[in-house]
Regions:
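Fold-independent oxyanion-binding glycine-rich loops
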Residues: 8, 14-15, 33-34, 63, ...
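Glycine-rich phosphate/pyrophosphate-binding beta-alpha loops
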Residues: 139, 244-275
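Glycine/threonine-rich beta-strand-loop-alpha-helix active-site module
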Residues: 70-176
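ATP/NTP phosphate-donor binding region
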Residues: 1-86
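Carboxylate- and glycine-rich phosphate/diphosphate-binding segment that chelates Mg2+/Mn2+
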Residues: 147-253
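Structural motif
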Residues: 9, 28-29, 58, 85-88, ...
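Gly/Pro-rich interdomain helix-loop hinge
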Residues: 267-298
Protein backbone atom coordinates (compact mmCIF):
# COMPACT_ATOMS: atom_id res chain seq x y z
CA UNK A 1 0.00 0.00 0.00
CA UNK A 2 1.24 3.49 -0.89
CA UNK A 3 0.18 6.86 0.45
CA UNK A 4 -0.13 10.20 -1.37
CA UNK A 5 -0.22 13.13 1.06
CA UNK A 6 -0.39 16.77 -0.05
CA UNK A 7 -1.48 20.03 1.61
CA UNK A 8 -5.24 20.28 2.06
CA UNK A 9 -5.28 23.61 0.20
CA UNK A 10 -2.83 24.93 -2.36
CA UNK A 11 -3.30 28.50 -3.57
CA UNK A 12 -1.30 29.46 -6.65
CA UNK A 13 -0.94 32.30 -9.12
CA UNK A 14 -0.30 36.01 -8.72
CA UNK A 15 -2.05 37.44 -5.71
CA UNK A 16 -2.35 34.06 -3.98
CA UNK A 17 -0.74 35.55 -0.88
CA UNK A 18 -4.09 37.15 -0.09
CA UNK A 19 -5.40 33.68 0.79
CA UNK A 20 -3.93 34.33 4.24
CA UNK A 21 -6.99 36.47 4.89
CA UNK A 22 -9.12 33.32 4.90
CA UNK A 23 -7.25 31.46 7.66
CA UNK A 24 -9.25 30.93 10.83
CA UNK A 25 -7.42 31.32 14.12
CA UNK A 26 -6.48 33.57 17.02
CA UNK A 27 -2.68 33.73 16.89
CA UNK A 28 -0.12 33.24 14.13
CA UNK A 29 3.65 33.13 14.38
CA UNK A 30 5.52 33.98 11.18
CA UNK A 31 8.89 32.26 10.69
CA UNK A 32 11.19 33.99 8.23
CA UNK A 33 14.84 33.92 7.21
CA UNK A 34 17.02 36.85 6.19
CA UNK A 35 15.91 40.32 5.21
CA UNK A 36 14.75 39.80 1.62
CA UNK A 37 11.08 39.16 2.45
CA UNK A 38 11.03 42.27 4.62
CA UNK A 39 13.03 44.31 2.10
CA UNK A 40 10.64 43.53 -0.77
CA UNK A 41 7.54 44.16 1.34
CA UNK A 42 6.19 40.61 1.44
CA UNK A 43 6.61 40.18 5.19
CA UNK A 44 4.53 43.28 5.81
CA UNK A 45 1.83 41.90 3.51
CA UNK A 46 1.79 38.58 5.38
CA UNK A 47 1.42 40.32 8.73
CA UNK A 48 -1.27 42.63 7.36
CA UNK A 49 -3.31 39.79 5.83
CA UNK A 50 -3.11 37.72 9.01
CA UNK A 51 -4.25 40.67 11.09
CA UNK A 52 -7.08 41.20 8.62
CA UNK A 53 -8.04 37.58 9.34
CA UNK A 54 -8.40 38.61 12.97
CA UNK A 55 -5.18 37.10 14.31
CA UNK A 56 -2.55 38.41 16.68
CA UNK A 57 0.82 38.07 14.94
CA UNK A 58 4.35 37.51 16.20
CA UNK A 59 7.55 37.22 14.15
CA UNK A 60 10.44 34.80 14.49
CA UNK A 61 13.16 36.19 12.24
CA UNK A 62 16.70 35.31 11.27
CA UNK A 63 16.55 31.64 10.32
CA UNK A 64 19.91 30.94 8.72
CA UNK A 65 20.61 28.98 5.52
CA UNK A 66 20.89 25.29 6.44
CA UNK A 67 19.01 25.84 9.72
CA UNK A 68 20.52 24.47 12.91
CA UNK A 69 19.10 22.43 15.76
CA UNK A 70 19.75 25.44 18.02
CA UNK A 71 17.62 27.71 15.83
CA UNK A 72 14.84 25.13 15.80
CA UNK A 73 14.84 24.94 19.59
CA UNK A 74 14.79 28.75 19.92
CA UNK A 75 11.85 28.94 17.55
CA UNK A 76 9.98 26.21 19.42
CA UNK A 77 10.53 28.10 22.68
CA UNK A 78 9.13 31.28 21.10
CA UNK A 79 6.08 29.33 19.95
CA UNK A 80 5.57 27.84 23.41
CA UNK A 81 5.63 31.31 24.94
CA UNK A 82 3.29 32.84 22.34
CA UNK A 83 0.89 29.92 21.84
CA UNK A 84 -0.03 30.22 18.13
CA UNK A 85 -2.69 28.14 16.43
CA UNK A 86 -1.13 28.90 13.02
CA UNK A 87 2.53 28.61 12.07
CA UNK A 88 3.21 30.55 8.87
CA UNK A 89 6.62 30.36 7.24
CA UNK A 90 7.72 32.48 4.30
CA UNK A 91 10.97 32.39 2.37
CA UNK A 92 13.25 29.79 0.85
CA UNK A 93 13.55 26.21 1.95
CA UNK A 94 15.48 27.02 5.12
CA UNK A 95 12.86 28.94 7.12
CA UNK A 96 10.11 26.54 6.04
CA UNK A 97 12.18 23.49 6.96
CA UNK A 98 13.09 25.05 10.30
CA UNK A 99 9.47 25.93 11.04
CA UNK A 100 8.39 22.34 10.39
CA UNK A 101 10.80 21.08 13.05
CA UNK A 102 9.84 23.91 15.44
CA UNK A 103 6.23 22.82 15.04
CA UNK A 104 7.02 19.33 16.34
CA UNK A 105 8.90 20.62 19.40
CA UNK A 106 6.17 23.18 20.09
CA UNK A 107 3.50 20.50 20.20
CA UNK A 108 5.69 17.93 21.96
CA UNK A 109 8.33 19.69 24.14
CA UNK A 110 9.66 16.39 25.48
CA UNK A 111 10.41 14.82 22.11
CA UNK A 112 14.11 14.63 21.21
CA UNK A 113 15.81 15.55 17.96
CA UNK A 114 17.07 11.97 17.77
CA UNK A 115 13.45 10.78 17.89
CA UNK A 116 12.55 12.99 14.93
CA UNK A 117 15.52 11.75 12.90
CA UNK A 118 13.92 8.30 12.71
CA UNK A 119 11.95 8.29 9.42
CA UNK A 120 8.20 8.53 9.86
CA UNK A 121 8.45 8.57 13.65
CA UNK A 122 6.85 11.97 14.36
CA UNK A 123 4.07 12.17 16.93
CA UNK A 124 0.66 13.25 15.65
CA UNK A 125 0.74 17.00 14.99
CA UNK A 126 -2.03 19.63 14.82
CA UNK A 127 -2.94 19.32 18.49
CA UNK A 128 -1.96 22.98 18.92
CA UNK A 129 -1.39 24.51 15.48
CA UNK A 130 -1.72 24.16 11.73
CA UNK A 131 0.97 25.04 9.21
CA UNK A 132 1.07 27.34 6.18
CA UNK A 133 4.12 27.47 3.89
CA UNK A 134 4.89 30.25 1.41
CA UNK A 135 7.95 29.66 -0.82
CA UNK A 136 9.91 32.57 -2.24
CA UNK A 137 12.34 30.44 -4.25
CA UNK A 138 11.62 27.92 -6.99
CA UNK A 139 13.53 24.84 -5.95
CA UNK A 140 13.02 22.99 -2.68
CA UNK A 141 9.21 22.60 -2.86
CA UNK A 142 9.18 22.06 0.90
CA UNK A 143 5.76 23.74 0.91
CA UNK A 144 4.22 20.48 -0.34
CA UNK A 145 6.55 17.80 0.99
CA UNK A 146 6.82 15.56 4.02
CA UNK A 147 10.46 16.51 4.54
CA UNK A 148 12.68 18.96 6.39
CA UNK A 149 16.48 19.22 6.52
CA UNK A 150 18.08 20.36 9.78
CA UNK A 151 21.82 20.58 10.49
CA UNK A 152 23.51 19.51 13.71
CA UNK A 153 26.62 21.67 13.50
CA UNK A 154 28.20 20.02 16.54
CA UNK A 155 28.23 16.71 14.66
CA UNK A 156 28.63 18.27 11.23
CA UNK A 157 25.66 16.33 9.87
CA UNK A 158 22.60 17.41 7.87
CA UNK A 159 19.62 15.34 8.98
CA UNK A 160 16.64 14.80 6.66
CA UNK A 161 13.47 14.62 8.76
CA UNK A 162 10.67 12.67 7.10
CA UNK A 163 7.06 12.26 8.15
CA UNK A 164 3.68 12.85 6.53
CA UNK A 165 2.75 14.83 9.67
CA UNK A 166 4.96 17.74 8.58
CA UNK A 167 3.28 18.15 5.21
CA UNK A 168 1.84 21.69 5.46
CA UNK A 169 -1.90 22.20 5.73
CA UNK A 170 -1.81 25.15 3.35
CA UNK A 171 0.69 26.02 0.61
CA UNK A 172 0.69 29.42 -1.09
CA UNK A 173 2.65 29.37 -4.35
CA UNK A 174 2.62 33.01 -5.44
CA UNK A 175 5.07 33.75 -8.30
CA UNK A 176 5.38 37.40 -7.28
CA UNK A 177 7.68 36.29 -4.46
CA UNK A 178 9.92 34.41 -6.90
CA UNK A 179 10.29 37.51 -9.08
CA UNK A 180 12.76 38.88 -6.52
CA UNK A 181 15.29 36.05 -6.98
CA UNK A 182 18.72 37.07 -8.35
CA UNK A 183 19.98 35.25 -11.45
CA UNK A 184 22.35 32.90 -9.61
CA UNK A 185 19.63 31.78 -7.22
CA UNK A 186 17.22 31.36 -10.13
CA UNK A 187 19.71 29.04 -11.84
CA UNK A 188 20.60 27.01 -8.76
CA UNK A 189 17.06 26.51 -7.52
CA UNK A 190 15.85 25.71 -11.03
CA UNK A 191 18.37 22.93 -11.40
CA UNK A 192 17.50 21.71 -7.90
CA UNK A 193 13.90 21.40 -9.07
CA UNK A 194 15.01 19.53 -12.19
CA UNK A 195 17.00 17.12 -10.03
CA UNK A 196 13.94 16.52 -7.85
CA UNK A 197 11.79 15.77 -10.89
CA UNK A 198 14.31 13.42 -12.49
CA UNK A 199 15.00 11.53 -9.27
CA UNK A 200 11.28 11.13 -8.63
CA UNK A 201 10.73 9.80 -12.15
CA UNK A 202 13.49 7.18 -11.96
CA UNK A 203 12.80 6.25 -8.33
CA UNK A 204 11.95 2.64 -7.60
CA UNK A 205 8.93 4.02 -5.72
CA UNK A 206 7.57 5.99 -8.68
CA UNK A 207 3.97 5.22 -9.56
CA UNK A 208 1.03 6.29 -11.73
CA UNK A 209 0.40 9.22 -9.40
CA UNK A 210 3.95 10.59 -9.37
CA UNK A 211 5.02 10.06 -12.99
CA UNK A 212 2.72 12.70 -14.56
CA UNK A 213 3.85 15.27 -11.99
CA UNK A 214 7.54 14.51 -12.47
CA UNK A 215 7.34 14.42 -16.27
CA UNK A 216 5.41 17.66 -16.55
CA UNK A 217 7.85 19.33 -14.17
CA UNK A 218 10.75 18.18 -16.37
CA UNK A 219 8.99 19.56 -19.45
CA UNK A 220 8.26 22.92 -17.83
CA UNK A 221 11.76 23.33 -16.42
CA UNK A 222 13.34 22.38 -19.76
CA UNK A 223 11.28 25.07 -21.49
CA UNK A 224 11.26 27.87 -18.95
CA UNK A 225 14.42 27.77 -16.83
CA UNK A 226 16.64 29.70 -19.25
CA UNK A 227 14.00 32.38 -20.01
CA UNK A 228 13.39 32.66 -16.26
CA UNK A 229 17.12 33.13 -15.70
CA UNK A 230 17.12 35.85 -18.36
CA UNK A 231 14.41 37.81 -16.57
CA UNK A 232 11.18 36.65 -18.23
CA UNK A 233 8.68 36.89 -15.37
CA UNK A 234 6.06 34.76 -17.09
CA UNK A 235 8.70 32.03 -17.28
CA UNK A 236 9.55 32.70 -13.64
CA UNK A 237 5.91 31.95 -12.76
CA UNK A 238 6.03 28.70 -14.75
CA UNK A 239 9.17 27.69 -12.85
CA UNK A 240 7.47 28.38 -9.53
CA UNK A 241 4.71 25.97 -10.52
CA UNK A 242 7.16 23.42 -11.94
CA UNK A 243 9.21 23.15 -8.77
CA UNK A 244 6.00 22.59 -6.81
CA UNK A 245 4.97 19.76 -9.14
CA UNK A 246 8.41 18.20 -8.73
CA UNK A 247 7.99 18.44 -4.96
CA UNK A 248 4.65 16.66 -5.08
CA UNK A 249 6.29 13.87 -7.07
CA UNK A 250 9.35 13.35 -4.90
CA UNK A 251 7.44 13.67 -1.64
CA UNK A 252 5.83 10.36 -2.61
CA UNK A 253 8.44 8.72 -4.88
CA UNK A 254 11.33 9.92 -2.67
CA UNK A 255 14.82 10.91 -3.77
CA UNK A 256 17.89 8.77 -4.36
CA UNK A 257 21.64 8.62 -4.54
CA UNK A 258 22.01 12.10 -6.06
CA UNK A 259 20.75 13.83 -2.93
CA UNK A 260 22.51 11.35 -0.66
CA UNK A 261 25.83 12.21 -2.28
CA UNK A 262 25.10 15.92 -2.54
CA UNK A 263 24.27 16.34 1.15
CA UNK A 264 27.52 14.66 2.18
CA UNK A 265 29.58 16.68 -0.29
CA UNK A 266 28.01 19.91 0.97
CA UNK A 267 29.21 19.04 4.48
CA UNK A 268 32.74 18.49 3.16
CA UNK A 269 32.95 21.49 0.84
CA UNK A 270 30.42 24.07 2.14
CA UNK A 271 29.12 24.37 -1.44
CA UNK A 272 25.53 25.33 -2.22
CA UNK A 273 23.23 22.29 -2.08
CA UNK A 274 21.48 23.17 -5.35
CA UNK A 275 24.82 23.46 -7.16
CA UNK A 276 26.00 20.17 -5.67
CA UNK A 277 22.76 18.45 -6.68
CA UNK A 278 23.47 19.37 -10.29
CA UNK A 279 27.05 18.11 -10.13
CA UNK A 280 26.07 14.76 -8.64
CA UNK A 281 23.09 14.44 -11.00
CA UNK A 282 25.41 14.76 -13.99
CA UNK A 283 27.85 12.26 -12.49
CA UNK A 284 25.11 9.73 -11.75
CA UNK A 285 23.63 10.10 -15.23
CA UNK A 286 27.03 9.49 -16.85
CA UNK A 287 27.56 6.46 -14.62
CA UNK A 288 24.11 5.12 -15.43
CA UNK A 289 24.63 5.65 -19.16
CA UNK A 290 28.03 3.92 -19.14
CA UNK A 291 26.61 1.01 -17.13
CA UNK A 292 23.73 0.58 -19.56
CA UNK A 293 26.13 0.75 -22.51
CA UNK A 294 28.42 -1.90 -21.04
CA UNK A 295 25.47 -4.19 -20.35
CA UNK A 296 24.46 -3.99 -24.01
CA UNK A 297 27.83 -5.42 -25.05
CA UNK A 298 27.84 -8.35 -22.64
Amino acid sequence: MARFTLPRDLYHGKGALEALKTLKGKKAIVVVGGGSMKRFGFLDKVVSYLKEAGMEVQLFEGVEPDPSVDTVMKGAAAMTEFGPDWIVSIGGGSPIDAAKAMWAFYEYPNVTFEDLCIPFNFPTLRTKAKFCAIPSTSGTATEVTAFSVITDYKKGIKYPLADFNITPDVAIVDPELAETMPKKLTAHTGMDAMTHAIEAYVSTLHCEYTDPLALHAIELISEYLIPSYNGDMDARAKMHDAQCLAGMAFSIALLGIVHSMAHRLVQLTAADISFMDVQTQCTCQRLSASTQQSQKHR
